[in-house]
Every structure is written in structure tokens, then in C-alpha cells.
Regions:
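Extracytoplasmic/periplasmic substrate-recognition and gating elements
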Residues: 55-59, 99-168, 199
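Paired acidic/hydrophobic, glycine-rich loop segments that form the ligand-binding mouth/hinge
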Residues: 85-90, 108
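Beta->alpha turn/N-cap motifs
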Residues: 89-94, 126
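Extracytoplasmic/periplasmic solute-binding protein
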Residues: 1-45, 51, 75, 84
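Glycine-centered hinge/linker elements that transmit conformational signals in sensory
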Residues: 35-67, 98, 112
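Bilobed periplasmic-binding protein-like "clamshell/Venus-flytrap" ligand-binding domains
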Residues: 1-12, 61, 149-160, 244-252
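Short helices/loops that flank or line small-molecule/ion binding pockets
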Residues: 1-2, 71-87, 219, 223-226
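C-terminal capping/gating helix-and-loop segments adjacent to ligand/active sites or protein-protein/ligand interfaces
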Residues: 185-241
């Protein structure tokens, strides 16, 4: 109120973004057989909070409510224009915030929120892979071996401002090439969180049909937030959506 900022908090409108805090709250995402099991007590606890925050004004219905279905919507422009106090997003935002915000105001990254089960976000990002059908396997192998060396990775991460997947480098082995102290701190904060990422989050990120789960989660949760469904109805629809889409994929 003192700063006249209209939106206390915003999150990326995506199932991927919501899944990390849900896992922190105890969501398991899969059953004992490894099959998708999205709705459990952990997921309900996190989605209930998101629902409540939208009802009491902590989060703005106008942001998530401005799109439908599984459409992604970020709040990066609102945050860069000082219209949001706290923004839950990914490390890919850091370079553009350093460029767009500069020193217009102080912005500061904090670790992923903790729940009863973990302090975790979701892994993700880009990957450089070798194709098995290359006509030059020996040369490609040498290149990949060079790029995978700790020194090479440190230089690559430092220049590209990517968060390292290498656990040793993630705990302080990268000198990020930016003069912006806020961006450097943000990159170090995200890097330091890599070792604490939950195994459930890695399993979900690696699941080939995770998009089915992400889309069902965000689309049905949003319908509850804007008043089209109750939360209990949204949970039932999430499970129906996932079952139907997986059945369709099995026929492809």
C-alpha cells in the first residue's frame, strides 16, 4: 500500500509452475505403479491456497482469468513495470529483468518456497544432445566429451546465464558474466536450489506425458478460480481429463 503497487503476488499461469510448490506440499504426482495420480492431499493443499489468494485479492483474477484453457500467461511485464510485489517464475526471466528493469527499482530473488515435504521448484530448460544416427560418431563423441567437462560447462553457464544442472557447479562453481548485482544474486540463488530439487519433480519433468498433467491442472484450477467450477469439481475434471487424454494417446 505504501508503494501503491496494485498486485501483491503473481505466478506464471502454467501447470509446470504450480507443480513445484504442490510437490513441496507433499504431492506425489504418481501412484506406486508409476502411473499419473495428480490429485492428492499435497496438490489439494497448494491449489486451495492459490484459490484463496485469488479470492482475497493477494493474486489478481484479471491475470489468470484473462485467458482460458491451458494457455500460458506470465506476469513479467507487470513485474518489470513495478505492478507486482512478488512474482513466482523461472530463471529464464533473469536476463530480461536485468535488461528491462536495470536499476529502476531493487528486485531480489528468493529460494523456492518450502512445504511439509520439500523446498523445491521444477527442473527444466534446454539440452544439447548427440543424435545416435550421426555419420560421425567419433567426432561427435569427442565434442560432447569436451562440452561435458567441468571447466567447459562452467564457461558455458557463465556466458549464457543458464542455471547449471551440474551439482558441483550449482553450489558455487560458476562466475556469471553479468555486472548487475541483482541478476548475479538471482542466478546464484537459483543455482543453489538445484541440489534440493525433489526427486518427484525430476520424475514429473521426465515423464513423457507430463504436458497432459500440467494442462489438466492449470485449466481446471483456473475454472475454479473464476467461479465456473468448485474446487472439488475441478479435481474430478483434472482426473477425467488425464484419463481421457492418456487413453487417446494409447490409441495413436
Amino acid at each position: 500500500e505504501k508503494l501503491d503497487i496494485p498486485i501483491p503476488m503473481a505466478w506464471d499461469r502454467s501447470g509446470h509452475r504450480v507443480s513445484g510448490p504442490a510437490i513441496a506440499m507433499g504431492a506425489q504426482m504418481f501412484d506406486a505403479a508409476g502411473e499419473p495420480a495428480l490429485v492428492d492431499d499435497g496438490l489439494k493443499e497448494m491449489t486451495q491456497r492459490l484459490y484463496d489468494w485469488h479470492q482475497d485479492g493477494t493474486m489478481s483474477k484479471e491475470l489468470w482469468g484473462s485467458v482460458s484453457g491451458s494457455t500460458y500467461l506470465g506476469a513479467n511485464e507487470d513485474f518489470a513495470n513495478a505492478q507486482v510485489v512478488m512474482y513466482m517464475s523461472g530463471s529464464w526471466q533473469i536476463p530480461q529483468f536485468a535488461d528491462k528493469i536495470g536499476d529502476a527499482f531493487d528486485w531480489w530473488a528468493v529460494p523456492a518456497p518450502c512445504g511439509a515435504a520439500a523446498c523445491t521448484g521444477m527442473p527444466g530448460g534446454a539440452a544439447l544432445v548427440a543424435m545416435k544416427d550421426t555419420k560421425h560418431p567419433a567426432e561427435v563423441g569427442k565434442l560432447m566429451d569436451f562440452l561435458a567437462q567441468e571447466e567447459s560447462l562452467a564457461e558455458f553457464y557463465g556466458k549464457t546465464l543458464f542455471i547449471p544442472g551440474h551439482l558441483k557447479l550449482a553450489t558455487g562453481g560458476v562466475d556469471f558474466a553479468t555486472d548487475d548485482p541483482r541478476a548475479k544474486h538471482a542466478l546464484q540463488t537459483f543455482s543453489g536450489a538445484v541440489p534440493t530439487i525433489s526427486s518427484v519433480a525430476f520424475d514429473l519433468q521426465g515423464y513423457k506425458n507430463n504436458r497432459v498433467m500440467f494442462n489438466a491442472l492449470i485449466s481446471r484450477l483456473n475454472e475454479a478460480i473464476v467461479g465456473e467450477l468448485t474446487l472439488d469439481q475441478a479435481y474430478a475434471r483434472m482426473e477425467e481429463d488425464i484419463a481421457n487424454q492418456l487413453a487417446e494417446k494409447a490409441l495413436e
